[in-house]
Amino acid sequence: MMQGILIVDKPMDWTSFDVVAKLRGVLGTRKLGHSGTLDPMATGVLPVFCGGASKAVDLQLNHDKTYRATLRLGARTDSGDSTGTVLETAPVTAGEKELLAVLPQFIGPQMQVPPMYSAVKINGQPLYKLAREGVTVERKARPIEIYGIEYGGSPAENEYVLTVRCSKGTYIRTLLEEIATAMGQKGTMSALRRTAAGLYTEADAHTLEEILAAKEQGRAALEALMLPVESVFTPLPLLVVEPWVEQHLYNGCPTSRYPAADGRYRVRNAAGQFLGLANITGGVLRVEKLFVERN
């Protein structure tokens, strides 16, 4: 079974689940997981964890995201983006000057109410299903953080491109609506592309067409597109262990008086093979998660 991380450039009009379902057929395995759901209208970086690498989805060190989004002024929709039904229109009376003036107030930690058209669940029911039935319910605001917003110009009348660096759980649709409101305008998101997810960027991503072409060339070509699972953990210090310590890790046995500082480590064996994660506390080395089978 292939193991690694395949960074997909998600096409427009595909759900994240559509991409995973397609890759199950391409890779010949159901053991896949993805990180960071993208709306169907969005494109861009979607990390897909294959085989044993799927165990790393919940262990990622960096969940921050970067998006390139387009704000369109003049109308507000029920979904917060241009795929939704227009609820309200208004003449546009503000532009670039007003936009640049309000952006600084959106930088930093803040609370954000999830949109009705989202996968957040209330009493086990996804909000988007309630929204499709015309039902609106109260949602609790959640903590998010906007690290930076860069202005990228105006590609068309009343449209403005923004690059947003933010924490996990940020809804860009909601952010753009709030920016429009601060400008005294009605607004909606007309385009969205994720350019980075955690440690991975557009430069790491492959289109579905490229992945399908690699499949035609054989297993080696597919594996060449994948990043090693260790890439998720590169911010952690590296610990290279002796063979007897490696066996302790396989057996789940702690190693006492280990000569290294306390902390969390990514671990390789003497041959350079990535084994997994381990923690040292009080000089005792303990395995956290293994990504290899026992020898």
Residue ranges of model-derived segments:
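Catalytic cores of RNA-modifying enzymes
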Residues: M1-S167, I172-H206
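Accessory RNA 3′-end/elbow-binding domains used by RNA modification enzymes
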Residues: M1-D13, F17-H34, L38, A42, ...
